[in-house]
Amino acid sequence: MVQVTTLAAAVVLGAAASTSAVERWYNPHGVNPGLKNIQHVVLFMQENRAFDHYFGTMAGVRGFQDPNVHVSKNTNKDVFHQPVSRNMWNGDTLQPLGYFPPKDVNELKPYYLAWQGGDWANRTQCMVAGTNDWRQNHAAYNRGEMDKWAMANTPYSIGYVHEADIPVQYKLAEAFTVGDMYYESIMSSTAPNRVSWFSGTINPPKGSKVNGTNKHMGGPTLDNRDSVGCERTDSGKPFSCVPLRWKTVPEYLQEAGISWRVYQDKDNFGDDPLVMWKQYQTSAKKKGDLAQRGTSFPGLQKFFDDARDGKLPEVSYIVAPMQLSEHPPYMPM
């Protein structure tokens, strides 16, 4: 899951149209008021859009003009020169892609997805570019040389959009700090990245109070899995087990007396990973506090109502519904 994470407040979208309004909101005194004045943190994670895919052409960021990107030992060129050949894979099926570059073309550079014009500006925002699973992403990573994105995860994986295609995201990026050195927690799919988001790790941390080996505690979480049980390596070793049993960030917040809640609709695209933890499953059976705060469905409207009425907890997590997740084929917001 290549993701975009935005840390902001509920009023950002409304204020983004006016730079002066934004400046008054987050810095009302004209100086840095300090962390002690931050009363609410809102965490919002979206799906499957890379930084360069959105902001590679943005001025002032480490995008496509970055002179310090890695030079592959295999090509002796920087990673913006991606090799192509007749051996390209379909990232979803791991089968030959079925179409090939023109004769004598052996590399592909980042390109504007809607280069054909017309309705392609809308159509390409819905396009799927390979997959984000562990195997395909690490094949593209190629032991750190990062020179097999087009080969192992389709040529679409290095395409980008322009500001005109995603004006809301650009308004946010221009008004606030943009994380051009922000990376996903793990080069893999949704579940492990969201597990890391809610717990700080994809594997039981050292010193966990849960008895047993890693397979009993659930880790390491390397790919998506919804049902109880484990995936297995070729040698039979377990990974991506469900349920998980180590401690989550919300539990630490609660112990520290910090209020928190997950805001989501029943359509949450399966993106609330707290349901994977045993303690939340147990809490749900007992109608306990962990489940009420973390795995229930208060609805996104509840977030807007609480923001309006000054009732937000100190830490809010937002999980978007499927069609607003930005996960291809669903469009950017």
Q: Predicted regions span which residues?
A:
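Gram-negative bacterial Sec-dependent N-terminal signal peptides
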Residues: 1-18
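N-terminal pro-sequences and low-complexity stem/linker regions of secreted or lumenal proteins
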Residues: 21-333
